[in-house]
Amino acid sequence: MSNTFEESLKSMSLDYLNLLINGQAFSDVTFSVEGRLVHAHRCILAARSLFFRKFFCESDPSQPGAEPANQTGSGARAAAVGGVIPVNSVGYEVFLLLLQFLYSGQVSIVPHKHEPRSNCGDRGCWHTHCTAAVDLSLDILAAARYFGVEQLALLTQKHLTSMVEKASIEDVMKVLIASRKQDMHQLWTTCSYLIAKSGLPQEILAKHLPIELVAKIEELRLKSSMPLRSLMPHHHDLTSTLDLEDQKIRRMRRALDSSDVELVKLMVMGEGLNLDESLALIYAVENCSREVVKALLELGAADVNYPAGPTGKTALHIAAEMVSPDMVAVLLDHHADPNVQTVDGITPLDILRTLTSDFLFKGAIPGLTHIEPNKLRLCLELVQSAALVISREEGNNNSNDNNTMIYPRMKDEHTSGSSLDSRLVYLNLGATNRDIGDDNSNQREGMNLHHHHHDPSTMYHHHHHHF
């Protein structure tokens, strides 16, 4: 009897979902999201979401139970006259996932495995706990709260709670901030514990978290007797040692900001300042000029390939993310490794190729509009050339016959791919977005992928406007 009941519910869920997949079939409301039309049904949306119920009532005061409209924006007016309702508060992918949950009561909030994402440089990633997966879940959480779909919000919180156990500490910090904003106590507890356990000093935490959250993390550490920094040997001297280190780091950064590399040199020689542990090179790449970075490297006290933080990014990873040819060039001149990998196996070349792919096939995406195509092309060529030189040197230095047969093939393949990438970048960077095509088929295609593969398959671009 129970199985029959479950099958009946599943069948009904699929029937409702097919209404959404088929787009215009019996549709009586149309939304415009990121230039694409989404066809839906008022009765289902109103029954499942308090937000939509109020929205449709405000747009049609003659409806039974309609409440007086406090605000009648362009969306409400469009709904009243049967026009297209613009949606600017969420992206197309997240909006479709939200509707999928409203229609069927089920949704997969994990990106499609191996799908290229703008915020994941690993082409073979399964997107189970990477930055792309975390960002999508956070966007769904915000959308669920905005549209009053509490069941989806709770489902997403549960998913994030299990995800952060394997996520990078930077992503855990993002989730912590969101859990505080969305008042998700369980998620807050999990994230704050993970960050406290990480041992990152206040100086690093303050770069990613509001000061009041840093204070709460420190309070949790004191209550739990967690070490503030694993490199500090004496438990009873943690506070004083941290204060001294923080003072050194602040002085060093002020010196770098004023291009006073000589003062940094004196701090290294006289005060024992560790440029790697203080992330001096990372800070200089992010905030200073090429000349300062060059002078800092020429001191000989900083490891150009030092893996910083829990993610293991090097200065070259940061320069690649910034799309700064000047920084990329000066780092490569001082023997930065273009093949060095983060904890997640991502190289600087992976980052640049992912950014290039976004420009080639999707146009300048939101959040990356500051990137100049020519600079991206130059960065890619510089890093590719450096990787090719290393590949050739390894091939020439290898005396094994088998290896000498293998290396040229790798080199040729790499050269071909690099050349093709460069030509495509040169010809196509900065191209406009692809034609949108038929909106109804887009909706059907997007929903079919979610329905059959149980995960999203369209790129989501971050927006922060209002519905």
From Swiss-Prot:
Localization per record: Cytoplasm; Nucleus
A Pfam cross-reference name: DUF3420
Deleted gene: phenotype: Defects in rosette leaf development. bop1 and bop2 double mutant displays leafy petioles, loss of floral organ abscission, and asymmetric flowers subtended by a bract.
Assigned keywords, A-Z: ANK repeat, Cytoplasm, Metal-binding, Nucleus, Repeat, Ubl conjugation pathway, Zinc, Zinc-finger
Basic residues composition bias: residue spans: 449-467
Annotated stretches, region: Disordered: 434-467
GTP-binding found in the keyword field: no
InterPro entries named among the record's database cross-references: Ankyrin_rpt, Ankyrin_rpt-contain_sf, BTB/POZ_dom, NPR5/6, NPR_central_dom, SKP1/BTB/POZ_sf
Assembly notes: Homodimer or heterodimer with BOP2. Interacts with PAN.
Record text about domains: The BTB/POZ domain mediates the interaction with some component of ubiquitin ligase complexes.
Family per record: Belongs to the plant 'ANKYRIN-BTB/POZ' family. 'NOOT-BOP-COCH-like' (NBCL) subfamily.
Function: May act as a substrate-specific adapter of an E3 ubiquitin-protein ligase complex (CUL3-RBX1-BTB) which mediates the ubiquitination and subsequent proteasomal degradation of target proteins. Acts redundantly with BOP2. BOP1/2 promote leaf and floral meristem fate and determinacy in a pathway targeting AP1 and AGL24. BOP1/2 act as transcriptional co-regulators through direct interaction with TGA factors, including PAN, a direct regulator of AP1.
Name of the featured protein: Regulatory protein NPR6
Organism expressing this protein natively: Arabidopsis thaliana
